[in-house]
């Protein structure tokens, strides 16, 4: 348990100024030049290319000694030789300690994503269980993002499924409400959760404040890892209720005890000897790594997640795990213990850095015996199986991409395929979308939505596609070089017209070297009979059972799915807009308060000035502004009366 999940992490303040060589030298000579002014202090260094791209970020106890190692070029592996050859300048930031440098290095790597560093690819936020404290009947719910002041949190959980499962089971055992304060205050009869024994219905006084407070106390005790003592007490209460012939209460307590058993038995890993810890294991194969992280809180498994950090093939498991660990905890507090399956190169330094981030001591352990060792081995087995599955998938994916290259005559296997589609209804809520596929499947972090800004004639899909292409490729690099995030293949959902529209836009923008393919549905829009339009071939079809055809259909269908969901979300947002959105001085909070009080925007518009002034959270001046917005003739009359006096 913790008072708040982190919203901002501890990052050492930047100290010192960037040091850049006065002359534009490159490679070893550029590093020699930088060494003239680099101190022996601890800190972080950044190696930059001629275009200003950050190639690598590193930390050191002694910056001068560490950077000096790069001038011994023959002792470096090929990857680092290439990095040094591209370096034209260096920047440094001095820190107080090496641990501070390690934290700052991780922060820079996550922000700048240097191509020669080990990178944590998946950096999603994690859900937490939150117990509010601002109401006499506290609410338990799940929460992500910015913490709510004064609330108590448990977590993190690996994913939404894990937190939902625990939330449901906690509701079954403790009957705490999950509804918002507004819903609680507006209820006149119990909701369905009360009927299915998931809530005690404090909204209609089916439970006293004292009894509800007792349930809250028990929930705290359970979620904080003291379930054994709680279960023993409840068993005693159940037996006493039975002896007193209070069978209804005994049955209620029995159901709660069963809920505990459900929580504890819902995972294969529920270690009794581990209270709060993360289990972090790595498995390497074929130059790739998988890291499995299990979240153990209160001796319960809060789920696990697999990560596949990007790194060079020669990186060792220990180096990858160490770099991953520091980046992983950049925006979340580490637990008191982290269990690993290999020795880190600098475990004490990592412990010191994570202890700074947590504000308390953090211990990194590699268990040698007992239950902890068994749990770590189980997590490592999960990492191995996940990596083997991914390698098998990547092998199949590579064959498909080889087939795509062969079908369309590409010079090499495409690493980035961008697929585009549009969606609108008679010109309303028009959106264009881009989805990205490659060797590792769909890259959803690279997906893009384009809300069409220009006027759209109903049915003018060509005009929509032109705007999307102009916005996607309109910004070129200053030196004319191809940006790194440009695609190796453009796949357009449409026929010859869409193909010609896209080709014309790219020609107008001076964009060359990007193959364009349009995929059009066949007769009667039958899947498997699609026509393909390219710049180098006459329109053609692929055999109905060709795996490459299936893959291209998947790309098109994913773009279509994303376009439809984006369009629907845009339409829904438009439908949710209200007359109150246009009233000056009315933000989201006041809008919500007005709708809760009056029931609808129409009722607000029809309300008298006195009724508006009596609404909760609405001041006299705000009420006047609202009334005046809906009654401009009243404003004119009032102004005229004031002038006459």
Swiss-Prot record:
Function: The UvrABC repair system catalyzes the recognition and processing of DNA lesions. UvrC both incises the 5' and 3' sides of the lesion. The N-terminal half is responsible for the 3' incision and the C-terminal half is responsible for the 5' incision.
Protein family per UniProt: Belongs to the UvrC family.
The organism's place on the tree of life at top rank: Bacteria
The organism of origin for this protein: Gluconobacter oxydans (strain 621H)
UniProt-annotated location(s): Cytoplasm
Region (Disordered): 1-20
Residue ranges annotated for the UVR domain, each copy included: 228-263
Cellular component GO terms, alphabetical: cytoplasm; excinuclease repair complex
Classification via Pfam families: GIY-YIG (PF01541), HHH_5 (PF14520), UVR (PF02151), UvrC_RNaseH (PF22920), UvrC_RNaseH_dom (PF08459)
Lineage: Bacteria, Pseudomonadati, Pseudomonadota, Alphaproteobacteria, Acetobacterales
UniProt domain GIY-YIG: residue ranges: 40-118
Name listed for the protein in its UniProt record: UvrABC system protein C
């Amino acid at each position: 348990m913790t008072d708040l999940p982190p919203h901002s992490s501890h990052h050492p303040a930047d100290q010192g100024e960037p040091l850049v060589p006065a002359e534009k030298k490159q490679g070893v000579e550029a590093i020699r030049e930088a060494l003239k002014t680099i101190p022996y202090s601890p800190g972080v260094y950044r190696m930059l290319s001629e275009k200003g791209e950050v190639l690598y970020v590193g930390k050191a106890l002694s910056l001068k000694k560490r950077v000096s190692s790069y001038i011994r070029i023959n002792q470096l592996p090929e990857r680092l030789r290439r990095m040094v050859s591209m370096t034209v300048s260096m920047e440094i930031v001095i820190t107080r300690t090496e641990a501070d440098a390690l934290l700052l290095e991780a922060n820079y790597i996550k922000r700048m994503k240097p191509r020669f560093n080990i990178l944590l690819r998946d950096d999603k936020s994690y859900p937490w269980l939150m117990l509010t404290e601002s109401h006499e009947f506290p609410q338990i719910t799940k929460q992500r993002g910015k913490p709510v002041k004064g609330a108590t949190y448990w977590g993190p959980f690996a994913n939404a499924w894990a937190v939902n499962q625990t939330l449901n089971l906690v509701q079954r055992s403790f009957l705490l409400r999950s509804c918002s304060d507004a819903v609680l205050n507006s209820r006149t009869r119990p909701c369905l959760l009360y009927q299915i024994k998931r809530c005690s219905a404090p909204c209609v006084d089916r439970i006293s404040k004292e009894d509800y407070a007792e349930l809250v106390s028990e929930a705290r005790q359970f979620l904080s890892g003291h379930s054994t003592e709680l279960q023993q007490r409840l068993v005693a209460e159940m037996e006493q209720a039975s002896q007193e012939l209070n069978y209804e209460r005994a049955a209620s307590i029995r159901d709660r005890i069963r809920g505990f058993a459900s929580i504890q038995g819902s995972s294969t890993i529920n270690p009794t000897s581990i209270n709060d810890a993360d289990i972090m294991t790595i498995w390497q194969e074929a130059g790739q790594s998988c890291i499995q992280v299990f979240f153990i809180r209160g001796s319960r498994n809060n789920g696990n997640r697999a990560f596949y950090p990007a790194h060079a093939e020669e990186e060792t498991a220990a180096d990858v795990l160490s770099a991953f660990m520091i980046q992983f905890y950049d925006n979340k507090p580490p637990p008191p213990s982290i269990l690993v399956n290999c020795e880190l190169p600098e475990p004490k330094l990592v412990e010191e850095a994570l202890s700074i981030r947590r504000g308390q001591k953090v211990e990194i352990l590699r268990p040698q015996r007992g239950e902890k060792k068994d749990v770590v081995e189980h997590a490592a087995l999960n990492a191995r199986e996940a990596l083997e599955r991914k390698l098998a998938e990547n092998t199949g994916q590579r064959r498909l991409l080889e087939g795509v290259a062969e079908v369309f005559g590409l010079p090499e296997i495409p690493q980035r395929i961008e697929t585009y589609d549009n969606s609108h209804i008679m010109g309303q809520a028009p959106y264009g979308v881009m989805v990205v596929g490659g060797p590792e499947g769909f890259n959803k972090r690279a997906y893009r939505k384009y809300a069409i800004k220009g006027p759209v004639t109903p049915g003018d899909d060509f005009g929509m596609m032109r705007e999307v292409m102009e916005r996607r490729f309109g910004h070129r690099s200053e030196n004319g070089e191809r940006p790194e995030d440009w695609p190796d293949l453009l796949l357009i959902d449409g026929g010859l017209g869409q193909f010609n529209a896209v080709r014309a836009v790219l020609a107008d923008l001076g964009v060359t070297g990007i193959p364009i393919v349009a995929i059009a549905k066949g007769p009667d829009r039958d899947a498997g009979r699609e026509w393909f339009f390219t710049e180098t071939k006459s329109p053609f079809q692929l055999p109905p059972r060709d795996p490459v055809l299936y893959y291209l259909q998947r790309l098109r269908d994913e773009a279509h799915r994303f376009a439809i969901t984006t369009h629907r979300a845009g339409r829904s947002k438009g439908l949710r807009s209200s007359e109150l959105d246009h009233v000056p001085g009315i933000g989201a909070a006041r809008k919500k308060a007005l709708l809760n009080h009056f029931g609808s925007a129409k009722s607000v518009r029809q309300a008298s000035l006195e009724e508006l002034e009596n609404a909760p959270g609405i001041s006299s001046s705000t009420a006047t502004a609202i009334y005046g917005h809906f009654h401009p003739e009243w404003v004119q009359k009032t102004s005229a009366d004031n002038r006459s006096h």
